[in-house]
């Protein structure tokens, strides 16, 4: 008899896996109404235009990074490590929001098993409607396509399945919103930071950096900013007497975004005499353009030009054992 399993879906943004994938990736990103809230009738035409305009410039970033984002490989490795921890009672799959493997690919994998429950586990420690919320919405949309027979062709790979629609119309789905203050997650962050610090780290200034958001989203009630600040505060309880601040990166467009911006904060700190910086990505758990290009290349060069004596960027968690343990605990608590 086939054993029933709990499906675990790791949700992440995704990134282009080749230079040719950059424009369609950007198109998918700017087509997301949870991020860019413009009238829906013009959303896709605007997304097509923006993606074409930005693709050439973005391609240069990815050429510096080796021609692709490493996020897919790192997320799949996180899934593999988590699968090993959970063993055969669970089936762990990956659903990216803007590039392969997409949500429907994750659903196809789950269809091959006898699933009794699904747990959605975002790889975004802090909740935002633009990240976790968007991934939840996309998952809900794709599930509805599966349980509407005859309207969509996505079930063609399931030929011979006795009753494919039974699955997602009857299975309970648990959604983990966030874990920004989870003790194991904080422990993972602290361990990862300590493992990459120089001996004289107390002579450094800790600069935490997170993905920025339009200020209006926060004013409308999104908890992302407050949760990110809480994460930083909990981490810094383990580093007494070290000076620190939080900044935001990756602003796009003319509207007002969360500040201070990371590059401007670097400039301010160096001008004020803090010439030894430890830069800590706090909202990312894998490497991508915002860490490898912005933090390492762009901001690293800015710091050097401004006279920084040392600029150390802490790696993201990736498959850090304590982070995988965090994910395991979250899954078990929601099983």
Curated annotation (Swiss-Prot):
Binding site for Fe cation: 211, 290
Keyword Metal-binding: yes
InterPro entries membership: Ferrochelatase (IPR001015), Ferrochelatase_AS (IPR019772), Ferrochelatase_C (IPR033644), Ferrochelatase_N (IPR033659)
Keyword Metal-binding: yes
GO BP: any one term: heme biosynthetic process
A GO molecular function held by the record: ferrochelatase activity
GO terms under cellular component: cytoplasm
Compartmental location: Cytoplasm
Catalytic activity: heme b + 2 H(+) = protoporphyrin IX + Fe(2+)
Associated pathway: Porphyrin-containing compound metabolism; protoheme biosynthesis; protoheme from protoporphyrin-IX: step 1/1
Keywords attached to this entry: Cytoplasm, Heme biosynthesis, Iron, Lyase, Metal-binding, Porphyrin biosynthesis
Pfam annotation, one family: Ferrochelatase
EC numbers on record: 4.98.1.1
Function according to Swiss-Prot or TrEMBL: Catalyzes the ferrous insertion into protoporphyrin IX.
Protein's recorded name: Ferrochelatase
Source organism of this protein record: Sulfurihydrogenibium sp. (strain YO3AOP1)
Higher taxonomy: Bacteria, Pseudomonadati, Aquificota, Aquificia, Aquificales
Gene: hemH
């Amino acid at each position: 008899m086939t054993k029933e399993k709990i499906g675990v879906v790791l949700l992440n943004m995704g990134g282009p896996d080749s230079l040719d994938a950059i424009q369609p990736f950007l198109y998918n990103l700017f087509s997301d109404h949870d991020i860019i809230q413009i009238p829906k009738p013009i959303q896709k035409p605007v997304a097509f235009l923006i993606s074409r305009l930005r693709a050439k410039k973005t391609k240069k970033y990815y050429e510096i990074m080796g021609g692709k984002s490493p996020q897919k490989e790192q997320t799949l490795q996180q899934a593999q490590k988590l699968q090993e921890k959970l063993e055969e009672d669970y089936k762990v799959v990956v659903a990216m929001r803007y590039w392969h493997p997409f949500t429907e690919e994750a659903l196809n994998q789950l269809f091959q098993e006898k699933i009794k429950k699904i747990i959605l586990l975002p790889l975004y420690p802090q909740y935002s409607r633009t990240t976790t919320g968007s991934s939840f919405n996309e998952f809900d949309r794709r599930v509805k396509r599966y349980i509407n027979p005859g309207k969509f062709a996505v079930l063609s790979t399931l030929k011979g399945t006795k009753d494919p629609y039974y699955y997602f119309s009857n299975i309970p789905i648990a959604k983990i919103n966030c874990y920004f203050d989870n003790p194991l997650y904080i422990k993972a962050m602290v361990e990862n930071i300590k493992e990459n610090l120089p001996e004289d780290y107390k002579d450094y200034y800790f600069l935490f950096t997170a993905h920025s958001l339009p200020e209006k989203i926060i004013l409308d009630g999104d908890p992302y900013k407050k949760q990110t600040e809480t994460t930083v505060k909990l981490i810094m309880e383990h580093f007494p007497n070290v000076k620190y601040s939080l900044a935001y990166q990756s602003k796009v467009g003319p509207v007002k975004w969360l500040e201070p911006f990371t590059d401007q904060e670097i400039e301010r700190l160096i001008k004020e005499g803090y010439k030894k910086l430890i830069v800590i990505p706090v909202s990312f758990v894998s490497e991508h353009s915002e860490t490898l290009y912005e933090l390492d290349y762009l901001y690293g060069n800015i710091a050097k030009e401004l006279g920084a004596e040392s600029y150390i960027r802490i790696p993201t968690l990736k498959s850090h054992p304590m982070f995988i343990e965090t994910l395991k605990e979250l899954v078990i608590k929601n099983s």
